[in-house]
Amino acid sequence: MQSMILFAAALMGAAVNGFVLPRTDDPDCETKATDCGSTSNIKYTVVKGDTLTSIAKKFKSGICNIVSVNKLANPNLIELGATLIIPENCSNPDNKSCVSTPAEPTETCVPGLPGSYTIVSGDTLTNISQDFNITLDSLIAANTQIENPDAIDVGQIITVPVCPSSQCEAVGTYNIVAGDLFVDLAATYHTTIGQIKALNNNVNPSKLKVGQQIILPQDCKNVTTAVA
């Protein structure tokens, strides 16, 4: 799932300088009006660090306009070295129609593990609760030592509420392959992004490399005991 395929999870990331190819007589680059109001397209070669957000901003385009023109299957993934057609200078850019908004968590505990999480740069309790698929209130309730939920420190260890009578069927090592994202691994192996992050605190999810080894919990669930 991810080598030098860029992590654009949440479609966020720093913009970097890429390669802009001049307009040609290629039919894909011909001057024509688009849904976003652009009358010109350019070819752009994706470089390390690019995201659709940064590219759209660079050329005053729309994330979903780029997705549409290039028929991209997943707006969260763009391949290093790929050539994209970019409708530039959009008067009505579309940055929402192709981006799904995750549902608010309703669970109050995490099945299996872990019981704690170490804060890293950029974390907020809101984002952490979403990564673990639990409500913000349940995370705050499990950490009464935190006086201000909006003020957490890098390196601080917080409690993650774990469901009683729950387990992960396996916790083992996994080697990253091309295209891997924590969000996809979580869905495939029935765990959460937060659980993967907690067990790989020194791993940057946006800089995964092919062959990199991570710890991966699998099939995390509540366990029901049959009544005789």
Swiss-Prot record:
Keyword Chaperone: no
Deleted gene: phenotype: Leads to a significant reduction in virulence on tomato.
Disulphide bonds in the chain: 36-90, 64-98, 109-163, 168-220
Localization in the cell: Secreted
GO cellular component assignments: extracellular region
Alphabetical keyword list: Chitin-binding, Disulfide bond, Glycoprotein, Repeat, Secreted, Signal, Virulence
Entries under InterPro entries matching the protein: LysM_dom, LysM_dom_sf
Binding site for chitin: 51, 53, 76, 78, 179, 181, 183, 205-206, 208
Signal sequence annotation: 1-18
Primary subcellular site in the record, as a coarse category: secreted
Mutagenesis / variant outcome for changing residue 51 to R: Results in improper protein folding but does not abolish chitin-binding
Gene Ontology molecular function: chitin binding
Induction description: Expression is up-regulated during plant infection.
Entry's free-text remark on domains: The LysM (lysin motif) domains are small globular domains involved in binding chitin in eukaryotes. ECP6 contains 3 LysM domains. LysM1 and LysM3 domains cooperate to bring two chitin-binding regions together, composing a novel type of binding groove in which one chitin tetramer is nearly completely buried and engaged in many non-covalent interactions, including 12 hydrogen bonds. The LysM1-LysM3 interdomain groove binds chitin with ultrahigh affinity.
Other comment: In plants, chitin acts as a microbe-associated molecular pattern (MAMP) that is recognized by lysin motif (LysM)-containing plant cell surface-localized pattern recognition receptors (PRRs) that activate a plethora of downstream immune responses.
PANTHER family named in the record: LYSM DOMAIN-CONTAINING GPI-ANCHORED PROTEIN 2, MEMBRANE-BOUND LYTIC MUREIN TRANSGLYCOSYLASE D
Function of the protein: Secreted effector that enables the plant pathogenic fungus to manipulate host defenses for successful infection. Binds chitine, but not to any other glycan, including the N-linked glycan chitobiose. Outcompetes host immune receptor for chitin binding through intrachain LysM dimerization. During infection, sequesters chitin oligosaccharides that are released from the cell walls of invading hyphae to prevent elicitation of host immunity.
Record-given protein name: Secreted LysM effector ECP6
Species lineage: Eukaryota, Fungi, Dikarya, Ascomycota, Pezizomycotina
